C-alpha cells in the first residue's frame, strides 16, 4: 500500500473529545496500557526508591497508572495533569493538585523528584523541547520515567489504513535524553493482543482513545468497513481464527 501517512500534527480539541468519550470504558479495554503501567512500576521499583516527596504525572487519564504507582511507592504530594478536564473526577490519590491543559505549557511552582508518564508522550507537539523542560523541573536526585511507542507501533492498522501517528525514532529519543540527562536506561518490547474480529480491534482503539487522529480521516462506511475486515483477516489472522494488534512500547528511565 506504500508508505504510511504519518500524522505529525496533534489536534488537541479532537484528542480531548476522543479521550473524554473513551474514559468510561478505558480501564476495561486498555489491556496493553495496564501492562505498560506495570512495567513502568517495575522499573521504578528496580531503582530501590520507595518514597518520593513530589510526583508529577503527565497524561494521567482515568488514573490506571496513577493507582499502579500508588501501590508501588509512597508519595507525599501528587501533581497530576491531563488535557481532558473530566479526568479530575477519576483521581483516587491524595494529597493532589490537578492541572487540566497542555502538558508542554503547564505552569510550575515547584520541582519534583519523580516526573512520569504512561502512553502520553507521543501526543506532545515538541518532544525534544519537552525533555529539556522536564530536566529543568527535576530535583538533583530526580527521575524521569516514561514510555512512548516505536515507529513500528500498531503495524496492522498502519498497513491496512496507510495511516498512523508519527513516533520519534529510538535514536532521536536517546539523543535528546542523552543531552539532558547523565544516565538513560531504555527497554523495548512487543505486546500482541488478539481479538475475535477486526471490528473488535476498531472498538478497542475507540474505547482507548487511540483513534484521536486528524479530522480528515475517511468516514467508516459499510463498504470501507467490509474491505478493512477482509484485508485485516487476510494479513493478520492467527491459526485459531483470531486477529492480532501489536503495540511496541519503548520505556525510558533517565536521571
From Swiss-Prot:
<dbReference type="InterPro" id="IPR029063">
    <property type="entry name" value="SAM-dependent_MTases_sf"/>
</dbReference>
<keyword id="KW-0093">Biotin biosynthesis</keyword>
<dbReference type="GO" id="GO:0102130">
    <property type="term" value="F:malonyl-CoA methyltransferase activity"/>
</dbReference>
<dbReference type="GO" id="GO:0009102">
    <property type="term" value="P:biotin biosynthetic process"/>
</dbReference>
<keyword id="KW-0489">Methyltransferase</keyword>
<keyword id="KW-0808">Transferase</keyword>
<dbReference type="InterPro" id="IPR050602">
    <property type="entry name" value="Malonyl-ACP_OMT"/>
</dbReference>
<dbReference type="InterPro" id="IPR011814">
    <property type="entry name" value="BioC"/>
</dbReference>
<comment type="pathway">
    <text>Cofactor biosynthesis; biotin biosynthesis.</text>
</comment>
<dbReference type="GO" id="GO:0032259">
    <property type="term" value="P:methylation"/>
</dbReference>
<comment type="function">
    <text>Converts the free carboxyl group of a malonyl-thioester to its methyl ester by transfer of a methyl group from S-adenosyl-L-methionine (SAM). It allows to synthesize pimeloyl-ACP via the fatty acid synthetic pathway.</text>
</comment>
<protein>
    <recommendedName>
        <fullName>Malonyl-[acyl-carrier protein] O-methyltransferase</fullName>
        <ecNumber>2.1.1.197</ecNumber>
    </recommendedName>
</protein>
<dbReference type="Pfam" id="PF13489">
    <property type="entry name" value="Methyltransf_23"/>
</dbReference>
<keyword id="KW-0949">S-adenosyl-L-methionine</keyword>
<dbReference type="GO" id="GO:0010340">
    <property type="term" value="F:carboxyl-O-methyltransferase activity"/>
</dbReference>
<comment type="similarity">
    <text>Belongs to the methyltransferase superfamily.</text>
</comment>
Amino acid at each position: 500500500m506504500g508508505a504510511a501517512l504519518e500524522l505529525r500534527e496533534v489536534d488537541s480539541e479532537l484528542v480531548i473529545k476522543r479521550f473524554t468519550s473513551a474514559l468510561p470504558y478505558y480501564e476495561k479495554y486498555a489491556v496493553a496500557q495496564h501492562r505498560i503501567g506495570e512495567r513502568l512500576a517495575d522499573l521504578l521499583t528496580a531503582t530501590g526508591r520507595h518514597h518520593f516527596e513530589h510526583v508529577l504525572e503527565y497524561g494521567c487519564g482515568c488514573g490506571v497508572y496513577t493507582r499502579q504507582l500508588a501501590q508501588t511507592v509512597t508519595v507525599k504530594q501528587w501533581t497530576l495533569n491531563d488535557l481532558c478536564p473530566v479526568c479530575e473526577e477519576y483521581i483516587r490519590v491524595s494529597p493532589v493538585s490537578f492541572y487540566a491543559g497542555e502538558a508542554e505549557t503547564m505552569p510550575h511552582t515547584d520541582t519534583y523528584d519523580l516526573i512520569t508518564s504512561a502512553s502520553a508522550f507521543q501526543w506532545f507537539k515538541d518532544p525534544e523541547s519537552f525533555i529539556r523542560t522536564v530536566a529543568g523541573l527535576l530535583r538533583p536526585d530526580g527521575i524521569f520515567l516514561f514510555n512512548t511507542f516505536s515507529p513500528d507501533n500498531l503495524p496492522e492498522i498502519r498497513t491496512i489504513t496507510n495511516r498512523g501517528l508519527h513516533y520519534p525514532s529510538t535514536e532521536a529519543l536517546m539523543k535528546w535524553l542523552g543531552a539532558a540527562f547523565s544516565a538513560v536506561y531504555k527497554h523495548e518490547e512487543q505486546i500482541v493482543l488478539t481479538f475475535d474480529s477486526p471490528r473488535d480491534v476498531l472498538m478497542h482503539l475507540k474505547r482507548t482513545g487511540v483513534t484521536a487522529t486528524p479530522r480528515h480521516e475517511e468516514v467508516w462506511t459499510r463498504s470501507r468497513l467490509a474491505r478493512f475486515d477482509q484485508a485485516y483477516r487476510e494479513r493478520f489472522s492467527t491459526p485459531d481464527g483470531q486477529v492480532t494488534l501489536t503495540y511496541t512500547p519503548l520505556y525510558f528511565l533517565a536521571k
